[in-house]
């Protein structure tokens, strides 16, 4: 799930790279990000390959890992030449910020 300042960062101009998106693949249904300086409440639910992105109590998007739809989207993306992209349904969780300071708090990971 993309974490981004939708008011200032150049990636905001493309919906698929705006806050809440499945980065560069699926755009959020609506912009629900709070202004800079306020914390957003994020929930990512992953159960049996079904993924949901929630931002500030609004479901932004959902998809099924391994579905023909997601495979088609990936096949047309910059990730198509990465053979392991979206192949594992277990592993480590990473937080990445390559566009300035990013702050997180109250991170909880629960098994469903």
Tell where the protein language model's regions lie, with residue ranges.
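Carbohydrate-interacting regions of secretory-pathway proteins
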Residues: 1-112
């Amino acid at each position: 799930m993309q974490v981004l300042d939708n008011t200032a960062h150049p990636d905001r101009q493309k919906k698929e790279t705006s806050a809440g998106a499945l980065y560069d693949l699926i755009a959020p249904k609506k912009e629900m990000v709070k202004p800079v300086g306020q914390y957003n409440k994020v929930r990512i639910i992953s159960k049996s390959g079904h993924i949901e992105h929630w931002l500030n109590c609004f479901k932004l998007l959902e998809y099924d890992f391994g579905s023909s739809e997601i495979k088609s989207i990936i096949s047309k993306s910059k990730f198509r030449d990465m053979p392991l992209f979206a192949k594992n349904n277990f592993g480590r969780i990473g937080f990445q910020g390559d566009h300035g300071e990013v702050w997180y708090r109250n991170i909880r990971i629960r098994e469903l």
